[in-house]
Amino acid sequence: VLRNHSKVKAWGLEHVPETGPFITAARHVTMYDVFVPMVSMFHQGRRPRYMAKAEMAKWPLIGKWFQLVGMQPVQRRAGKAKAIEETSVEILTSGRPLTVWPEGTVTRDPQKWPMSMKNGVGVIALESSRRLGCQVPLYCAVTWGAASINHWWPWPRKNVVMCYDEALDYADLLDGCDSWGDEVPTDRADELTRRIRVRMTEIMAEIRGEQAPDGYWDYRTMSRVKD
């Protein structure tokens, strides 16, 4: 699908660790852009688990493919967040990489900038780091151009770019982690999630050659809000 519809240029893949667990936090502008980090990781010889809504596993043909490449079904219902986070942490602490889309769904920002994100990515990164006793590498992957692929006709192929950024440092948020108790402090998970969104916005601005708007799009209010 990706090769038929697009010409992908990716940079920064040298940052992908050859071994061990790591987290890729990817942008979600369109349904097509989920394939870009998948293919990129495949060519790097890594096979992450992918957190994706459970309904995708039931899609004709492509659902079976998602399962084969490492899809981790997510039941997106109230009360399931803790179970999803625990499954993700277990994937990482077992030594496997994980890819997540922190926006939770295709962005609703009319201009396609990163919107509000669920702090589960922060919880997963911090808790897995605490259990492993070291900071789990976390990378932002930003794809742009896939939104122009809006039909199944493969020609003309669209240009798609992806930047796989350097590891995002969050060592300061792990200070005192041995005293957290049973749960990651919400303020720390929120802060790490904010850093991911801000960094994604910076990368997106560089790719697009534009200045990002003030604030970010809030999914709950469907409006732009200040940081």
Language model features with spans:
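A short, well-structured juxtamembrane/interface segment
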Residues: 1-20
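Residue-level preference for the first positions of well-ordered beta-strands
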Residues: 21-23, 97-101, 137
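A conserved mid-domain beta-alpha-beta active-site/ligand-binding segment of alpha/beta enzyme cores
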Residues: 171-180, 187-205
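Short, highly charged C-terminal tails/helix-capping segments
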Residues: 208-227
